[in-house]
Amino acid sequence: MRALRVSQALVRSFSSTARNRFENRVAEKQKLFQEDNGLPVHLKGGATDNILYRVTMTLCLGGTLYSLYCLGWASFPHKK
């Protein structure tokens, strides 16, 4: 029974400290993402979102091209 009380106290202390350490900025983010400025939602976060979007698209395109290359290479017979 004592172990149960100790574990509950530990969980309570860990979960409450993390929650109180950061300020709530949901209203700021909602205001940023809901304003009508013509940008797509995945680019409204700024330069970091733009870079992340471009890197993701480059990796997707590269992976698609590489998979097509591997399919083409595997479809032809190889000399032995």
Swiss-Prot record:
Q: What is its main location?
A: mitochondrion
Compartments where found: Mitochondrion inner membrane
Residue ranges annotated as Mitochondrial intermembrane topological domain? 76-80
Alphabetical keyword list: Membrane, Mitochondrion, Mitochondrion inner membrane, Oxidoreductase, Transit peptide, Transmembrane, Transmembrane helix
GO biological process terms, semicolon-separated: mitochondrial electron transport, cytochrome c to oxygen; mitochondrial respirasome assembly
Record topology, Mitochondrial matrix segments: 22-46
Which InterPro entries does the record match to this protein?
Answer: COX7a (IPR039297), Cyt_c_oxidase_su7a_sf (IPR036539), Cytc_oxidase_su7a_met (IPR003177)
Q: In which pathway does it act?
A: Energy metabolism; oxidative phosphorylation
Q: Where are the transmembrane segments?
A: 47-75
Q: Where is the transit peptide?
A: 1-21
On whether Cytoplasm is a keyword of this UniProt record, the answer is no
Instruction: Identify one Pfam family in the record.
Output: COX7a
Record's Gene Ontology CC terms? mitochondrial inner membrane; mitochondrion; respiratory chain complex; respiratory chain complex IV
Q: Has keyword Membrane?
A: yes
Membrane-topology descriptor: Single-pass membrane protein
What family does the Swiss-Prot or TrEMBL record give for this protein?
Answer: Belongs to the cytochrome c oxidase VIIa family.
Q: What does this protein do?
A: Component of the mitochondrial respiratory complex IV (CIV, also named cytochrome c oxidase complex), the last enzyme in the mitochondrial electron transport chain which drives oxidative phosphorylation. The CIV complex is the component of the respiratory chain that catalyzes the reduction of oxygen to water. Acts as an assembly factor that specifically drives the homodimerization of CIV complexes, mediating the formation of mitochondrial respiratory supercomplexes (respirasomes) containing two CIV: supercomplxes with two molecules of CIV show improved activity.
State what protein this is by name: Cytochrome c oxidase subunit 7A1, mitochondrial
For this protein's source organism, the top of the classification is:
Eukaryota, Metazoa, Chordata, Craniata, Vertebrata
